[in-house]
């Protein structure tokens, strides 16, 4: 389902994690229209990774899926302090 021009704003929830650090890791992204309508959900195993790598891969997956759906404005939601603060320019790498 493509995002209509009227709903070009989407909300993207992302999460990634590893069992062990590093260890077997997985990522997920859920894309919803601004009104809450589910547009897409994806999850995948990514092999061995650290928790931070998994969180970043989840962020990229969410952004890629939103772009593929035609979104022009994103609200990104995640639980990684590192990712949130880096994206908001509070942490420098």
Where are these regions (language model features)?
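Short beta-strand scaffold segments in enzyme catalytic cores
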Residues: 27-31
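Short connector loops/turns at beta-strand edges and beta->alpha or beta->beta junctions
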Residues: 32-38, 79-83
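Short connector loops at helix/strand junctions that flank enzyme active sites
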Residues: 7-9, 24, 53, 69-71
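Short amphipathic alpha-helical face segments that pack within enzyme cores
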Residues: 53, 57-61
């Amino acid at each position: 389902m493509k995002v209509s021009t009227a709903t070009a704003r989407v909300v993207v929830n992302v999460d990634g994690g590893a069992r062990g650090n590093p260890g077997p890791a997985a990522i997920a992204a859920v894309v919803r229209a601004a009104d809450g309508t589910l547009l897409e959900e994806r999850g995948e195993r990514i092999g061995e990774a650290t928790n931070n790598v998994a969180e970043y891969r989840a962020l990229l997956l969410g952004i890629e899926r939103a772009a593929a759906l035609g979104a022009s404005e994103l609200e990104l939601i995640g639980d990684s302090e590192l990712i949130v603060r880096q994206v908001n320019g509070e942490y420098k790498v």
